[in-house]
């Protein structure tokens, strides 16, 4: 819900950094994969209840996620890059939840419900993007993206705030 309203504030900084990294020969896919690897380090950190360290790795993942898009806009968006970005984001999001489940198995039903909701929203997100592609629907409200999608009640910003609160205030 908030993502499209804050893009004009954060994109200029990320785009400037992205252009610099691009000029150094760094590709968007390299940043995507590196960010994913950093984010996946949060899984064992969460499992061992090292929440601040997990938060740091998760934050790096999100920064790299913003940078890969900025680099892609500079170098040219590719289908492979869009695929990697979406798939690795979904894996990261579910890995964070799984890390919390490993830390507190007695809370697994809540984590299972959250992953269930990710599957539902992720499926509708991807199905709508196929529909939008076939019907030539586009917008730049969320920046230049490899796929088009509608805004939702909760998007990336709200998801990250929730994950931050979960790390800072574990039950």
Language model segments and positions:
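Short, flexible coil/turn micro-motifs enriched in small/turn-prone residues
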Residues: 30, 76, 147-150
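Membrane-embedded alpha-helical segments that form the functional core of polytopic membrane enzymes
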Residues: 32-80, 113-116, 171
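A feature for the membrane-embedded catalytic helix bundles of lipid/isoprenoid biosynthetic enzymes
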Residues: 1-18, 87-171
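Gly/Ser/Thr-rich beta-alpha loop segments that engage phosphate groups in nucleotides
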Residues: 37, 71, 84, 154-158
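Short juxtamembrane and helix-loop transition motifs at transmembrane-helix boundaries
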Residues: 13-23, 47-48, 71-79, 138-145
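Hydrophobic, well-structured mid-protein blocks that either form specific transmembrane helices
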Residues: 59-109
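Topogenic membrane-insertion module of multi-pass membrane proteins
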Residues: 1-53, 158
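Hydrophobic alpha-helical context, especially transmembrane and signal-peptide helices
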Residues: 26, 56-59, 80, 108, ...
């Amino acid at each position: 819900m908030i993502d499209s309203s804050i893009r004009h504030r954060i994109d200029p900084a990320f785009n400037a950094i992205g252009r610099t990294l691009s000029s150094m020969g760094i590709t968007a896919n390299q940043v995507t994969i590196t960010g994913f690897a950093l984010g996946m380090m949060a899984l064992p950190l969460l499992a061992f209840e090292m929440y601040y360290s997990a938060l740091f790795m998760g934050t790096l993942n999100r920064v790299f996620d913003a940078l890969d898009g900025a680099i892609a806009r500079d170098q040219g968006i590719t289908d492979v890059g869009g695929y990697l970005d979406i798939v690795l984001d979904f894996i990261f999001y579910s890995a964070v939840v799984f890390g919390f489940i490993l830390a507190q198995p007695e809370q697994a039903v809540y984590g299972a419900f959250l992953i269930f909701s990710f599957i539902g929203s992720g499926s509708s997100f991807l199905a709508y993007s196929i529909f939008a592609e076939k019907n030539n629907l586009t917008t730049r409200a969320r920046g230049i993206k490899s796929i088009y999608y509608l805004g939702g009640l909760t998007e990336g910003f709200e998801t990250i705030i929730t994950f931050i609160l979960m790390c800072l205030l574990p039950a």
